[in-house]
Swiss-Prot record:
Organism: Danio rerio (Zebrafish)
Function: Transcriptional regulator. Appears to mediate neuronal differentiation.
Tissue spec: In adult, expressed strongly in brain and more weakly in skin, muscle, eye and ovary.
One of the record's GO molecular function terms: protein dimerization activity
Placement of sequence motif Nuclear localization signal: 93-99
Known partners and oligomeric status: Efficient DNA binding requires dimerization with another bHLH protein.
Biased composition (Acidic residues): 64-83
Name this protein carries in UniProt: Neurogenic differentiation factor 2
Stretches with biased composition (Basic residues): 87-98
Region listing for Disordered, in residue ranges: 1-116
Record gene name: neurod2
Chief location: nucleus
Gene Ontology biological-process annotations: axon development; positive regulation of transcription by RNA polymerase II; sensory organ development
Record lineage: Eukaryota, Metazoa, Chordata, Craniata, Vertebrata
Keywords: Activator, Developmental protein, Differentiation, DNA-binding, Neurogenesis, Nucleus, Transcription, Transcription regulation
Biased composition (Basic and acidic residues): 28-44
Length: 363
C-alpha cells in the first residue's frame, strides 16, 4: 500500500488553511474579552455616578450599615480565632442589639399599639351607633359584638321581608325573625323592647305541642291475648275499653264465683269512674269496682278486701279462670293501694284449686 508524504505540494494548501482558522479564532476570543472588560468598566462608572446623585442620607445609611456589618464580622472572626478548633457558623449573622436599635423597635411597637387602639375605638363606636338603631336597648345590659351583629343582620332581613310582602307582619313572627340564632338574654331584651312577654313568645313558638303536652282525660288500654300455661285455662279473654285514671277489671270466670253480684269491693275516694269489660294483660289479675250492696262493703280498705255472701264451691269454677290486668295504670298514677290477689284474706278453707291458683302468683 502506497502512502503519501506530507511534504507533497498537493497537501500543503490544506494545512495552510487550517492554520488560518486557528489564528482567526484566537483573534476573535481576544476581541470578545476586551469588549466585556470595557462594559464592566462602564457599568462601574455608571453605578458610581448614581450613588453620588442618590442623596447623602441614603449613602450615609448604607455606609453605616456596611461599617456595622464589618465590625460584626471582625468580632466574629476574632472570636473564632480565639476559640481555635470551633467550626464556623453559617447563615446570616445576627446583628448586635445596640441602644439605638432598641429605641427604634420600641417606637415601632408603640405606633402599632396606637393603630390597634384606634381601630378598636372606631369599631366600638360603630357598634354603639348600631345598637341605637336595632330594636334592643338596655341601660344595664350591653350586648356582645357578635350578638349585636347577629341582631342587626336579623333586623335587616325582617325589614326586607316587610318591604317585599308589602304588609305589616305579626308581632310573634316578627320577634321570631329578629331572635333567630340569638341567646336567651338577648331574646328577652328584644321581646321587652317590643312589649311582648317572653313567656307568651315561647308559648307561641311551641303551639304545635313540641314542648307542652296536655294529657287527655281518658286513656285506652290495648289488650293482648296471652296463654296461661300454669293454669288449666288455655285462652285469656281480650278486650279494650276507655278507662279513667284508675280502673279495675275482673275475669268473667272469677265473677262466676260470686252469684249475687257481691264481688270483692275496693272503694277509692281519690279516683272513681266507669269501668269496662274484663281484660287480660300479662296474666295478672285485677279487681272490678261495682256499686256497694252492704254496709261492710262501703268501708274503704287499703290493703285487704272483705268477701261476703260467697255461694257455691270454687272448685267447679276455678279451672275456668281467665286472666285480667291488675287495674289499668294510666299516665303517672301509682298503684300502691291496689291489693294483690294473693293478699286477699279469706274466712273459708282453701280448696286445692285455690291453692293451685295462689301458688301461681307466689312463684
Amino acid at each position: 500500500m502506497l502512502t503519501r508524504l506530507f511534504k507533497e505540494p498537493s497537501l500543503l494548501p490544506d494545512m495552510q488553511k487550517f492554520g488560518g482558522w486557528v489564528d482567526d479564532s484566537g483573534s476573535e476570543d481576544s476581541k470578545t474579552k476586551d469588549e466585556e472588560q470595557e462594559r464592566c468598566r462602564l457599568g462601574d462608572e455608571d453605578l458610581d455616578e448614581g450613588s453620588v446623585k442618590g442623596g447623602g442620607s441614603r449613602a450615609q445609611s448604607e455606609i453605616a450599615g456596611e461599617e456595622d456589618y464589618d465590625e460584626d464580622v471582625d468580632e466574629d472572626d476574632c472570636g473564632e480565632e480565639g476559640d481555635g478548633d470551633r467550626p464556623k457558623k453559617r447563615g446570616p449573622k445576627k446583628r448586635k442589639m445596640t441602644p439605638a436599635r432598641l429605641e427604634r423597635s420600641k417606637v415601632r411597637r408603640q405606633k402599632a399599639n396606637a393603630r390597634e387602639r384606634t381601630r378598636m375605638h372606631d369599631l366600638n363606636s360603630a357598634l354603639d351607633n348600631l345598637l341605637k338603631v336595632v330594636p334592643c336597648y338596655s341601660k344595664t345590659q350591653k350586648l356582645s359584638k357578635i350578638e349585636t351583629l347577629r341582631l342587626a343582620k336579623n333586623y335587616i332581613w325582617a325589614l326586607s321581608e316587610i318591604l317585599r310582602n308589602g304588609k305589616r307582619p305579626d308581632v310573634v313572627s316578627y320577634v321570631q325573625t329578629l331572635c333567630k340564632g340569638l341567646s336567651q338574654p338577648t331574646t328577652n331584651l328584644v321581646a321587652g323592647c317590643l312589649q311582648l312577654n317572653s313567656r307568651n313568645f315561647l308559648t307561641e313558638q311551641c303551639q304545635e305541642g313540641v314542648r307542652f303536652h296536655t294529657p287527655t282525660p281518658s286513656f285506652s288500654i290495648q289488650s293482648y291475648p296471652y296463654q296461661c300455661s300454669r293454669l288449666s285455662s288455655t285462652n285469656c279473654q281480650s278486650g279494650s275499653s276507655t278507662h279513667s285514671l284508675r280502673n279495675h277489671s275482673l275475669c268473667s270466670a272469677y265473677e262466676a264465683l260470686y252469684t249475687e253480684g257481691t264481688s270483692p269491693e275496693y272503694i277509692s275516694a281519690d279516683f272513681e269512674g266507669h269501668h269496662g269489660p274484663p281484660v287480660c294483660v300479662n296474666g295478672n289479675f285485677g279487681v272490678r269496682q261495682e256499686e256497694p250492696l252492704s254496709p261492710d262493703a262501703e268501708r274503704g280498705y287499703q290493703y285487704s278486701m272483705h268477701y261476703t255472701n260467697l255461694h257455691g264451691s270454687r272448685s267447679s269454677a276455678a279451672h275456668g279462670i281467665t286472666c285480667g290486668p291488675p287495674g289499668a295504670r294510666s299516665g303517672s298514677v301509682h298503684s300502691e293501694n291496689l291489693p294483690l290477689f294473693h293478699d286477699v284474706h279469706m274466712h273459708h278453707d282453701r280448696t286445692p284449686a285455690y291453692e293451685e291458683l295462689n301458688a301461681f302468683f307466689h312463684s
